[in-house]
């Protein structure tokens, strides 16, 4: 996965340059983390403990380094950068198969907290803003007059046979 993310950073960079060559004006960048950035080490399904490659510390380290690398690569190309995230179910702090603390006590979100602290230390990245929910499983952003909602798919448990039906059902109840 790390190799694919590193390739994605290069591909996005190339696409930005390509669009600008075509005359497309790009001044704002939005980077979203939609959860499950880490797999966790157990408590989600029976085989999880035996199917992961890295312990939780290493998973968080790899995810943080990839996120920071992406932002460091892209941020100098934009006037404004907004980085936002929502928690996923695999990032939950779990015990005996259940999330036992707050929604905000989530490894997916803590990776973004750590990245925010890293970028806050460097004046070169003052144009990078982070939006990190304190204890919500979702957030909304106004992007150039369009309200955009972010939520991880584990919110959509009921409301239809297909995932898009479940998402619409969940959204209508908000």
What is each PLM-predicted segment?
Residues 1-174:
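Extended recognition/assembly regions associated with phosphoester-bond processing machinery
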